[in-house]
Amino acid sequence: MGLREGIPGTVFRADYQPPDFSVSHVALEVSIFDGLTEVVATLSLERNGPEGAPLKLDGEQLDLQWIELDGQRLAESGFELTANQLVIPNLPDRCVVRTCVQICPEENTSLEGFYRSQSAYCTQCEAEGFRKITYYPDRPDVLAIYTVTLEADRQTCPVLLSNGNLILEEEAAEGRHRATWHDPFPKPAHLFAMVAGDLKQVSDVFTTCSGKPVDLRIWVEEKDVNYCDYAMQSLKNAMLWDEQVYGLEYDLDLYNIVAVDDFNMGAMENKSLNVFNTSCVLAHPDITTDAGFQRVEGVVAHEYFHNYSGNRVTCRDWFQLTLKEGFTVFRDSEFSADINSRGVKRVEDVIFLRTHQFAEDAGPMAHPVRPDAFVDISNFYTLTVYEKGAEVVRMLHTLLGHKQFIEGASLYFRRFDGQAVTCDDFVDCMAEASGRDLAQFRRWYAQAGTPEVIANGHYDQAAEQYHLTLKQLNRPTPGQTDKAPLPIPVATGLLVDGKPIPLDSGTTRILELSEPEQTFTFDGVLARPVASLLRGFSAPVRLTIDQSESDLLTLMSGDDDDFVAWDAAQSLLARAIEALDLTGQESKIHSALREAIERVLVGPMDAAM
């Protein structure tokens, strides 16, 4: 029995069915008053499912005022209303449904849907918050074009924002005003956003690769306007990087970021209207550490990169969450590596993965990066889905090489633009672009747990050959007792006389461990080498190898791979601490370690390392 089988309310990936109705256009009229907000939603619907299937709209904590079908008010006998759903039977294949609800954002303490923060009204709709704003098929595979009109008191809410481009501003009665926004790109409900409040803007302009100017605005409380410059520069850097690396140009005329103190997630990638917690936007040398600057840079870039990997191409269902999050974490990690020190960034990511995600994989809640079942999707915004998901994408990048990986990503964005798709669709594009069979690779999406790779090397001096035997162990995890071998890219180098020797690609050869045990042979090795394994941490695995202190010293001071050199230093330092703890005095390893550190300091290694 699977981990969640038999639990009431469990949703299974295998049970996925397309929606019975699609929504081509959503028109929202939102009138904000103190203590009450009225939302009129107009949905243009078309039947996808079987004839006679009723329309089922999700809704929670909504006070329904009325319903119209094609302009005619429905009597209570014409629909069924429950605590979390509105069901309308006997609909024509094409129709327009209009609803009016009242909500109270001031009393919404869940911080999901539409709520009042200290400084503004704002939204959080991922994963299932839109149903707290209006009745809607609140699922990621229903994509629609939105036109939103916000009305509020001008004095208390002078700023009215939503997705897309501002198309109309006008005065209303009794000191109120309206703003109408139109987003021409179809999106799921979880990417909807609206903000109303007394906010100040920090502005800049980015000129895209085609020469189009894009207005950039960061909206904050007045007290925070002097702390947005770094976030703005990070946004511009991310926009340029996405053009240069992926060929992706921003697609609207305006990009807004709103930062509030009491946002319940770090940040949210709503189309063209990101909402952030201030901790991920505000930075200044007087108040921010280096780590704080890096966090702002990484989170701003992550949310921007979602514009394509998550927004233009989105998830069919929430089981595919890693499709957008794993891919985008990989993208923001590569961005930070290019902007700063690649070695330092990789080491930081590995430390986090080993410390936190490996523990999740080893515990009772171990799950694949693409789960098969959930009770509450909010519980699957996990390190496995995000961080291990990014490592799965990185392995594709390693196996295919940068050029073919980018070709696969470009095919993915072209083929599925404006669609809600799956992890399999992503892998299909990588396979098609590279001409490789990636059938076995899909196991990474299905199997939980951290594989262990055991390495043993043998040098044949007479034949001038080095034989490296790799064995993989995939131990049982909850709900998965029998594991199949995974394709594990083990980036490998060899050091002879303290220096890396030429291999397939520079000083690295990618060994593809796809069986329980395999032996790889290196020819033309003139002396016993020291193996440099898992270069760049090429796979999210635990590596077991018997290495002498001499081998570790060689790797620490002579390897040209920053991760392996750092990892060797960690092992040596641990041994030195253990030796000092046992004897109470320095030993041979301590003097050797000092010499290795001196060689690193004067060597060619990245100074940031």
Predicted regions and their residues:
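N-terminal, polar/Ser/Thr-rich
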Residues: 1-38, 115-124, 131, 136, ...
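Short, hydrophobic/aromatic-enriched beta-strand segments in well-ordered soluble domains
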Residues: 40-45, 59, 91-108, 146-154, ...
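Surface-exposed beta-strand/loop patches in extracellular or lumenal glycoproteins
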Residues: 40-62, 135-138, 144-153, 424, ...
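A surface-exposed beta-strand-loop module
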Residues: 31, 48-50, 54-55, 59-117, ...
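Long, ordered, helix-rich scaffold segments
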Residues: 354-355, 382, 523-609
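Extended, low-hydrophobicity, Ser/Thr/Pro/Gly-biased non-transmembrane segments
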Residues: 100-203, 227-230, 441, 561-566
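Beta-strand-rich binding/interaction modules
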Residues: 63-70, 192, 437-440, 450-533
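Hydrophobic alpha-helical and helix-loop surface patches within well-folded domains
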Residues: 181, 209-462, 468
